[in-house]
């Protein structure tokens, strides 16, 4: 059986189809929302418009790659996180499309959250499907979150720690835009950082399971003002994020020893961060970029699990 996943975040419009019999992603597609040069994202009304405009053509594209008449359930990100009061208008576009698709074919509609989708995609891509059936520590690190979560699969989520101010993705994007790169700027910051061969010594602020990243933006601005080049400052920024995650992860492992640590969210696409963290955190799981950044893959997988059509316990 096939399941369809839809996610309309503040960064991208994403669709995916999952085959429950094969346990594989049949296809997925994503379109980043257009952001004007020099701007740090979109207003919610603009994001909602761009999602609404993009979805019909993207469904046509998906239909050319998978037989959508075989879809038996539809999953959608209806809000950012599975906590009370979590809401962003941009997700209404996905809910509208998913509702129309499901009603037209009398299919079950499973409303999920953007964060659950990130977690499920990362658990799947980690290659150990038992992660869906046991506890793990999961970092969701993006432009809207720097969350440390205790998860049982992607369904039961307990927040453990977060940033008290700026999110990691915001720090990366603000640096990238300051350097003249388009938003979202993570890929460009990573490319610049890879050019730096100098040693960098990150300075971070972590207290227990809570971090502060507001100082990172100021540190990067000062480094640029002091004459450091873009590659050095980009490397400094990413390694500060990496060191922050290392300290939070090891503090969490002191309280929850032996658990796997899974890293999800767009910022976790950075090769530099992955290398830095995996050398310092035991049992760390990073995944390929398309499973880390915004996607609908995790939503399509969770739709299958909600319908008991992909029981990982039997694998």
Question: Where are the model-predicted features located?
Answer:
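Short glycine-aspartate micro-motif
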Residues: 3-6, 73-75, 136-140, 262
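Glycine-rich phosphate-binding/hydrolytic loop that grips phosphoryl groups
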Residues: 118-122, 287-315
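Glycine-rich beta-strand-to-loop/alpha-helix junction loops that act as flexible
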Residues: 76-79, 142-144, 262-270
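Conserved phosphate-binding catalytic cores of ATP/NTP-utilizing and phosphoryl-transfer enzymes
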Residues: 1, 107, 111-136, 301-305
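N-terminal phosphate-binding loop and adjacent alpha-helix
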Residues: 33-66
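A contiguous, well-structured pocket-lining segment that forms one wall/lid of small-molecule binding clefts
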Residues: 190-261, 267-284, 304-312
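A short helix-loop
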Residues: 8-9, 16-18, 23-28, 130-134, ...
